[in-house]
Amino acid sequence: PIKSSAASDVYKRQYQYIVMDLEIELILSSLRNIISDEQEDFVASLPTFMQPYASFNILGLAGARSLDEVIEAVAGTAYEPVLRRCQKQYPPDGNTLRYTRYELALRTCYFSTLLERAKRETRGRASAELRELITMRAELMNLNTIYRMKTYFQADADRIRVTMLPFYSRLRPRQLEEMVSARDTQAFLKLLSATPYGRRIDPETGFFEGETDGVRYRATRRLLRFSTSPEVVYTAFMLLRSMETEDIVRIIEAVSYTHLTL
């Protein structure tokens, strides 16, 4: 009974990592739909199955028509002070929001919370392995952002810099700054090739996010197979399941898009 209870506690703690991720995606979806005024589509896509695990009322969020109503829907959660700070610093103009600033603040809250939990609830090697899982995801998200902004928007360094998550795994801050400041996509990829990710990401790829997903998948699978920590193994398992779901969604979206454009 003691072992069973301990295992249950581990699963409950690690499952919260996934729940928080989904909650933030819902809040960001709500903000995007306020900007684009597509509330009906948002309501239809709500994952109501997760309501028993969520820290706020999902349907309440679905009814939000303004930033104030989003904040009201998440009142009493860790997201409320984050959104209020953004609202004060970047006040909305009607339905117009500085979306990337809100996204950065929420994702920073997410990764900071995960790192604090890992430090508080694990020790030694298990803590280091959880930190690797968490910070690598943030770092690869930064690389994806740099690639997209340079490739599709020809964004300058200042515009990219303010979107960077403040977490590092295998890169040094100086290396990330050099890639942010690279003059174009090719210069960015050349700098990336000199980093620990260089041997794992094909610079000729036509699908950069697929390459970074592969890096994350292999690192996560390695910890799933070889870690001796229940917390790490379960977190790795949940993250792999999440990645598989993301892949399925991408395939469905690609097929739907192809069908619509034929």
What do these predicted ranges mean?
Residues 1-7, 11, 259-262:
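Single conserved hydrophobic/aromatic residue that forms the stacking wall/gate
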Residues 5-35:
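An N-terminal, globular interaction/scaffold subdomain
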Residues 32-56, 151-169, 256-260:
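Extended intrinsically disordered, low-complexity coil regions enriched in Ser, Thr, Gly, Ala
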